[in-house]
């Protein structure tokens, strides 16, 4: 499906929970501000089933922290049974050492792991948890079981910017495939923490100097730098960036049952909770959800647009 701005809809992001065992001060919560209402596994898979009918072939599980869902493995297995070619997840890695193998067997294809520091002290200051070593073990487990590409997310801010350069070195030593250096943006808790925002220009200039090739990612048109080691460094600057929005191919299912068409907005959402919890047959629910998707696609628009 193509929206009225010519952007294809290819990716479904599902927030499994708002609960998290970390307390990162800038968490964007997938742009959601509603209650932590947990959709059932059946609800999630029904929405995902309808999304497949619209040509969506990629799904990412997010949170909060998705590994806190006890039915996570079953959800992953169900998504693969629906025919999704690409099932991925973003996690803080705390529980990954014990879950990586089970998730791989269930069909998880790849994984993003958040690691916003390279030292225990900075890690604890950012997350509120002394778990740096445990997350490193989770990363190693993901690599060992073949959840590739393993990507690490590093949100750059004033509290950790000096570690961004060392983060590149650590990532190469760990053997991960790719890292994302992400600009802090004012969504979720990031609204309150935006004073900690730090410009990525100096870091990107350094990466460009040491890289052997520069690429542009089709999704969001992000710059990607290939280092001599083979590590790919992607620079993510979404805020006030029309280029980022022009390449957006996502729709989100929020934790409280809304189809969310934009990370930055709460006014253009379609509430499907009543459909999911209503006393309808599954066929009727699918039909109603299909209509909801059509409306969501119709109202979808870039938050940041080029000024003409």
From Swiss-Prot:
Cofactor descriptive note: Binds 2 [4Fe-4S] clusters. Binds 1 [4Fe-4S] cluster coordinated with 3 cysteines and an exchangeable S-adenosyl-L-methionine and 1 [4Fe-4S] cluster coordinated with 3 cysteines and the GTP-derived substrate.
Q: Which residues bind GTP?
A: 13, 60, 90, 151, 250-252
Keyword Nucleotide-binding assigned: yes
Q: What EC number(s) does this enzyme carry?
A: 4.1.99.22
Residues involved in [4Fe-4S] cluster 2 binding:
245, 248, 262
Per its UniProt entry, which superkingdom is the organism in? Archaea
Per UniProt, S-adenosyl-L-methionine binds at: 64, 114
Radical SAM core domain segment(s):
4-222
Cofactor section: [4Fe-4S] cluster
List the GO biological process terms. Mo-molybdopterin cofactor biosynthetic process
Coiled coil residues, start to end: none
Reactions it catalyzes: GTP + AH2 + S-adenosyl-L-methionine = (8S)-3',8-cyclo-7,8-dihydroguanosine 5'-triphosphate + 5'-deoxyadenosine + L-methionine + A + H(+)
UniProt keywords, alphabetically = 4Fe-4S, GTP-binding, Iron, Iron-sulfur, Lyase, Metal-binding, Molybdenum cofactor biosynthesis, Nucleotide-binding, S-adenosyl-L-methionine
Q: What class of enzyme is it?
A: lyase
Q: Which GO terms describe its molecular function?
A: 4 iron, 4 sulfur cluster binding; cyclic pyranopterin monophosphate synthase activity; GTP 3',8'-cyclase activity; GTP binding; metal ion binding; S-adenosyl-L-methionine binding
Q: Where does [4Fe-4S] cluster 1 bind?
A: 20, 24, 27
Which positions make up the signal peptide?
none
Under the heading Pfam families, the entry gives: Mob_synth_C, Radical_SAM
Membrane-spanning ranges: none
Protein family (similarity comment) = Belongs to the radical SAM superfamily. MoaA family.
Function text? Catalyzes the cyclization of GTP to (8S)-3',8-cyclo-7,8-dihydroguanosine 5'-triphosphate.
Question: What name has this protein been given in UniProt?
Answer: Probable GTP 3',8-cyclase
According to its UniProt entry, this protein's organism is: Saccharolobus solfataricus (strain ATCC 35092 / DSM 1617 / JCM 11322 / P2)
Specify the taxonomic lineage. Answer: Archaea, Thermoproteota, Thermoprotei, Sulfolobales, Sulfolobaceae
């Amino acid at each position: 499906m193509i929206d009225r701005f010519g952007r294809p809809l290819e990716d479904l992001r599902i927030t499994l929970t708002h609960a998290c065992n970390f307390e990162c001060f800038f968490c964007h919560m997938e742009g959601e501000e509603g209650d932590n209402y947990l959709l059932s596994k059946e609800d999630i898979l029904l929405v995902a089933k309808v999304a497949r009918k619209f040509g969506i072939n990629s799904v990412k599980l997010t949170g909060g922290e998705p590994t806190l869902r006890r039915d996570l493995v079953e959800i992953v297995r169900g998504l693969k049974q629906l025919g999704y070619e690409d099932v991925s997840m973003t996690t803080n890695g705390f529980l990954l050492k014990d879950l990586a193998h089970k998730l791989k067997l269930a069909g998880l294809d790849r994984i993003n792991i958040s690691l916003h520091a390279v030292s225990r002290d900075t890690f604890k200051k950012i997350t509120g948890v002394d778990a740096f070593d445990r997350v490193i073990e989770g990363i190693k487990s993901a690599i060992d079981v073949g959840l590739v590409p393993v990507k690490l997310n590093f949100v750059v801010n004033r509290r950790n910017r000096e570690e961004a350069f060392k983060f590149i070195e650590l990532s190469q030593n760990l053997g991960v495939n790719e890292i994302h250096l992400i600009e802090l943006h004012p969504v979720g808790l990031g609204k309150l923490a935006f004073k900690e925002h730090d410009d990525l220009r100096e870091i990107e200039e350094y990466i460009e100097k040491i890289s052997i090739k520069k690429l542009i990612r089709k999704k969001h048109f992000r710059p990607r730098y290939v280092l001599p080691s083979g590590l790919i460094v992607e620079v993510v600057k979404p805020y006030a960036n029309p280029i980022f929005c022009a390449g957006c191919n996502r729709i989100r299912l929020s934790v409280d049952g809304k189809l969310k068409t934009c990370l930055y907005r709460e006014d253009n959402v379609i509430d499907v909770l009543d459909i999911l919890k209503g006393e309808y047959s599954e066929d009727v629910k699918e039909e109603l959800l299909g209509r909801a998707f059509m409306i969501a696609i119709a109202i979808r628009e870039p938050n940041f647009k080029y000024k003409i």
